[in-house]
Amino acid sequence: GRAIAIALRKALADAETPADRVDLLAPFGTGTRNYDAAEAAAWNEVFGSRLSEIPAMTTRGAIGVNGAGTGAIDFAATVTALARNTIPPSLNTSNPDPASRFRFVQDDPKDARITHAVTVSYALAGGQTAALVVRKVEE
C-alpha cells in the first residue's frame, strides 16, 4: 500500500488539491483480500477519518480487471461521473472489508455535486502505480 499512498499524495499535490476537497473516490478494488487490504491502508492513510464520508465507486465488480486497460477504463468512468454529477453503483460490493471504510454507492446511481475526484490504478504484478485527480472546470 505504500506505493499507492505515495501516488495519492503526489497526485493531490500536483493538482494543488487538499484531500478535504475531494468528493468522489475511485479505488482500484481488485476484490482480493491482500490487494484490497493494502489499498485500503493507503486510502486510510491519506484521507483519514474522512474516508468513510466520501462516496466511492469502482468498476471492478462489473467488468473485472482488464490488464493495462483498467486504469483508462476507471479514468473514463470517473470523468463521466464528474461530468454527469452522478455516481454509478459499484456492483458486487455489498460486503466490503469493514477496515476499508469505503462508502461505495450501492444499487442505484446517486446524484451528487462532484467537483474533485481521485482514481488510482496499479499493476497487480507490482512496479507501477498511478493516481489522478480530476477536477471539474466551471464555464
Label each region the model flagged:
Residues G1-E139:
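Conserved "HGTGT" condensation-loop signature of ketosynthase/thiolase-family condensing enzymes
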